[in-house]
Amino acid sequence: MAVLYNTISNMLEQETLEENEEYEALIIDCGGGTTDLCSYRFRIQDRRAAYKIYMETAYENGDTDFGGNNLTYRIMQILKIALVRAKGNQNVSSVKEILEYMDTDIYRFIDSHGVKEFYQYLEQEYQKAEETLPTRFADFERYNRSEYYKVKNNFYTLFNTAEQIKKLFYGKVGALEVTVTSEQKGQRENTVLLDKWKLSFWKGDSLTVEKTVPEVMMNYFEIELLLSGEIYGIVQKFMEELYHSGRIQDFSFIKLTGQSCKIDLFKDALKEFVPGRMIQF
C-alpha cells in the first residue's frame, strides 16, 4: 500500500488527479517466492493543508509458487548444463541448442501449450546433467551423509551463483555478458567468482570435489529468451480473465512492484493485455 501512496503523491505533484473522481489501480508485486495481484479504488479530497485519500482494496489473484526465485532457478538450470558440457559430457544438449528450440513465438506457444511444455526440453537436458553434476539432494537422503551434503552444497552453490548472474544482468550494471569462473587471476569485467572446492562431480561411482570448474559465459539475450516464458506465464495467469471480461479497462494504471518486476520482460508481457502507457514501475 505504501507503493500506491507514493504513486498518488507523484500524481498529485504532476496535477493528473481530479478531486472526488474515482480511480482504480492494479498492483502486481513479485517477491522472492510469491507474486500477488491486488486492486485499489481511490479518490482524493483537497483539504488545503493536506489531501484526504479514500481507498478500498481487494485481493484479486496470487501465486505462492512463483517469484524471483523461479527466475534464478531457470538461470541455475542453464548454468548447470553449461558446466556439464564444459566438463565434457556431450550427451547433454548445449545451451545454444536448448535456446534455439525455445526461440519461437513464445507468447503464442504458451497460449496454446502452456509454460510447462515450453520448458520441457530444458527440463529433459537438466535431468541428463544430473548424471554428471547432481543437485537433487532430496534424492540422496537415504545415501550416506557425506554424499547428501555434497549434493546439497552443489544446489546452493549453483543457485547463489545464478542469483549473482541475475543481478548483473538486471541490476544497475546492466551487463550484456557475464563470465563464471573459479580463477581469480585475469578476471574480465562482470565476472562471477565460483569458489574453488565447492562443486562435486560424479567420477565413476563416487562424488568427487573438484578444485576448479571450467569457465563458462552467458549473455543477456540468452537470459532474456530463457526467462520470457516464466514471466509471460505469470502475467497471462493474472491478466487473461481481466482482459477477456473487459474489466481491465476499468483501471487507470497498473503498477509493478518488487525487485523482479524491474525486469523489462514484465512490461513487455503486460503489453499483450494493456497499452504500455498504463504501466508504471
Residue ranges and their predicted role:
Residues 208-240:
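Adenine-nucleotide phosphate-binding core of ATP-dependent small-molecule kinases
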Residues 5-8, 37-39, 75, 262-269:
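A short acidic (Asp/Glu
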Residues 39-200:
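Phosphate-binding glycine-rich/basic clefts of nucleotide- and phosphate-handling proteins
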Residues 1, 270-281:
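Conserved phosphate-binding/catalytic loops in two-lobed NTP-binding clefts
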Residues 19-36, 40-43, 68, 258-260:
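A short acidic Gly-Thr/Ser loop motif
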Residues 11, 234-253:
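Phosphate/pyrophosphate-binding loops at sites that engage ATP/ADP/AMP, CoA/4′-phosphopantetheine
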Residues 150-154, 251-270:
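Glycine-rich phosphate-binding loops at beta-strand->alpha-helix junctions
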Residues 1-26:
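Nucleotide/phosphate-binding catalytic cleft detector across ATP-hydrolyzing
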